[in-house]
Amino acid sequence: MNPLRLYNTLGRRIETFESFDPLTVKMYVCGPTVYDYVHIGHGRAFVGFDGIVRYLKLRGFNVIRVQNITDIDDKIIKRANETGKDWREIVDYYTKDYMESLKALKVEIDQHPRVTSHIQEIIDFVQKLVDKGHAYITSSGSVYFDVDSFPSYGLLSGSKKEEWNQGEEIVKEKKNPYDFALWKAWKPGEPYWESPWGKGRPGWHIECSTMSTRYLGEQFDIHGGGVDLVFPHHENERAQSESLLGKIWVKYWVHVAYLTINKEKMSKSLGNIIPLNEALKKWGPSVLRFWYLSTKYRNSIDYSEQTLEQARSSLQRLKDAMGIIRSVIKEEPKSHSNEEEISTQREIISLIGKFHEAMSNDFDTATALSNIYEIANLVFTKIQYTRDFMGAMLAFDAFRQFNYVFGVMDEEFSPSYETMYKVIDSVVEIRNILRARKMYDLSDEIRSVLANAGIKILDGKEKSTWRFE
């Protein structure tokens, strides 16, 4: 098995992966702030990390994945004020959209902690930072992290603390303009919780430090998110967490690259934000997953009608190859393989190895997929005609491993589909008999019925095969 290597944003280099526990990988990924619909950029991160989790599991790791829900934040309060709705109504509505999108994309999360369910733990975390001299309380009741108390601040992002534009934060009550809020004092009309410093609510960065430590312990393996979170969010998380714990908090920082739309940055000002639920309705979960994972997670990806159509076509070709594989496997195996078949089998074994080599090299799904394409090509050009049983079995295993990671061909591997395949095979075989007897009207009628069910008949010289449309 190839050693597993991944790019660590902390250090900006490829490193050999070694989890704290050799059998378990603990991962925390920053989830959405639920004030609006999740969009296709969020979907890229959800599926990108899902591909990483799935490959880790394929290698035998037990993976614990935590992804938070930020359900109290400036943006949520602003949206509530704009709409005249209670902030909790806003949160519930968009949390439902988020959860439904995850389910559609077949992304499984072990823990989904919400900020408002961990207020006391956040308060305790902040108090400990105050006690250790890493945070200070202001006259307004806000609590700020003292960035100068953490000498390695900026190591993760490569940014200087002075570069941080903090927008609306109250600079005048801070020791330094770059200090950031751990606890925000209450303002009239805002939700609040009681604390030792008065009424208020958590700052953005403290919530992730608190909840990740709560569910994964004081040290865990992977902290992930979009590349836009490196600074200041993840930089601030690292500062406050390691200041409190006094040791390395996270081993590997992993970030997914930007998604653009027709080569332009996705933004509200350009009016080009595409809600994930709309993309799911248009393209379907499998095509979207396939499109996301066709590009390596650290490379930017551009959304366009053309690229999605290409993804749909490419996925269908793989499904067609799978149909041929199944048709060969159900035949009587030969007593031995000839030289041509043995050569094909060796090539498939080599390509399976290259698939794992690519996935082990910083989860390079794009290169891994290219090897699956080559196996599919062997199915179309060799196995389809030689009816090589062993070659088909090897290709079947390659597609099984591919689907374990990509999750785009689950139907082809589900038990219920085994029965359905047998039924369709029987119908097609009956049609072959009818064609042999030159009963073309009836055979054409069967073709029409199957077509209405989304099944396309492919007539050959001797017999017919089929595939899903």
Swiss-Prot record:
One of its GO terms (molecular function) is cysteine-tRNA ligase activity. Zn(2+) binds at C30, C208, H233, E237. Keywords: Aminoacyl-tRNA synthetase, ATP-binding, Cytoplasm, Ligase, Metal-binding, Nucleotide-binding, Protein biosynthesis, Zinc. SUPFAM superfamilies: Anticodon-binding domain of a subclass of class I aminoacyl-tRNA synthetases, Nucleotidylyl transferase. One of its GO terms (biological process) is cysteinyl-tRNA aminoacylation. One of its GO terms (cellular component) is cytoplasm. It catalyses: tRNA(Cys) + L-cysteine + ATP = L-cysteinyl-tRNA(Cys) + AMP + diphosphate. A motif ('HIGH' region) lies at residues 32-42. Its EC number is 6.1.1.16. The keyword Ligase applies. A motif ('KMSKS' region) lies at residues 265-269. It holds the Pfam family tRNA-synt_1e. Binds 1 zinc ion per subunit. InterPro entries: Cys-tRNA-ligase, Cys-tRNA-synt_Ia_DALR, Cys-tRNA/MSH_ligase, Rossmann-like_a/b/a_fold, tRNA-synt_1_cat_dom, tRNAsynth_Ia_anticodon-bd. Its cofactor is Zn(2+). It is found in: Cytoplasm. The keyword Aminoacyl-tRNA synthetase applies. Gene3D superfamilies: Cysteine-tRNA ligase, C-terminal anti-codon recognition domain (1.20.120.1910), HUPs (3.40.50.620). ATP binds at K268. NCBIfam families: cysS. Belongs to the class-I aminoacyl-tRNA synthetase family. This is Cysteine--tRNA ligase.
